[in-house]
Amino acid sequence: MSSTLYRRQLLKLLGMSVLGTSFSSCVTSPARAKTVNWGYIGKVGPEHWGELSPDFALCQIGRKQTPIDLQIADVKDVHSSSQDLLVTNYQPTALHLINNGKTVQVNYQPGSYLKYAHQKFELLQFHFHHFSEHRVDGKLYDMELHLVHRSKSGDLAVMGIFLQAGAFNPTLQIIWDATPQNQGTDKRIEDINIDASQFLPAQHRFFTYSGSLTTPPCSENVLWCVMATPIEASPAQIAKFSQMFPQNARPVQPLNDRLVIEAI
């Protein structure tokens, strides 16, 4: 089977557009979202996002929302090498950190990417959530890392990686040590490099489905790849983030009629 035909069949299973569909609104709308006060608790919390702005309507009425509870019994297996389906090429980049008041975000310089079914997505940034946003059979993890990518046509792909309490994580500590404490500030450190590949789990088995951004405006048709194997961070490292952001995770959303595929 040709790579193009394989990609067409896989994306059809996921219920996503096959070729040429731009998700550029997913990229530009979060900038507009900054002008609307939203958060994770109270009257600006997730259950009210759809009421805060017409731009946020999908947060309330969308049918392909993220995160979801990944129910293993309902997942469809694809017996294809996950390493062939999802290929990453992440290079070290100068550390550029932002504390935007919602999370800690690391912006990435051009040149790093992933390929999903032979479609290339450039790594734009990664950020963290506490607790995890996705669940696996109801299991909640301590944190979740999201690596956000965009193709030349504007398509978005996000890789989710669970973090659980365990061994000290030296790459994470580089970020924690440099994180600005004041909200709305950023820091660029040219002589310190960060390498996103250090966050990838040793096993590349992953779940994939068509979802959305997990923050307003909750734009849909985002390709999600959630790694099945968590990585570790020390309890102290998890505690440091949770002190800054006690709760910055959106609750799970209905799966509706979507299909979740596991690449094994």
UniProtKB/Swiss-Prot annotation:
Cofactor(s) the protein needs = Zn(2+)
What PTMs does it carry? Answer: Predicted to be exported by the Tat system. The position of the signal peptide cleavage has not been experimentally proven.
Q: Which GO terms describe its molecular function?
A: carbonate dehydratase activity; zinc ion binding
Q: Which domain of life is it from?
A: Bacteria
The UniProt keyword set, sorted, is: Lyase, Metal-binding, Signal, Zinc
Catalytic activity from the UniProt record: hydrogencarbonate + H(+) = CO2 + H2O
Tell me which positions the record assigns to the signal sequence: 1-33
- Alpha-carbonic anhydrase domain boundaries: 36-264
Sequence positions that bind Zn(2+): 127, 129, 146
Q: Where are the transmembrane segments?
A: none
Q: CDD domains of this UniProt entry?
A: alpha_CA_prokaryotic_like
Q: Which family does it belong to?
A: Belongs to the alpha-carbonic anhydrase family.
What role is this protein assigned?
Reversible hydration of carbon dioxide.
**PANTHER family listed in its UniProt record:** CARBONIC ANHYDRASE
Write the protein's name: Carbonic anhydrase
Organism the protein comes from: Nostoc sp. (strain PCC 7120 / SAG 25.82 / UTEX 2576)
Name the gene: ecaA
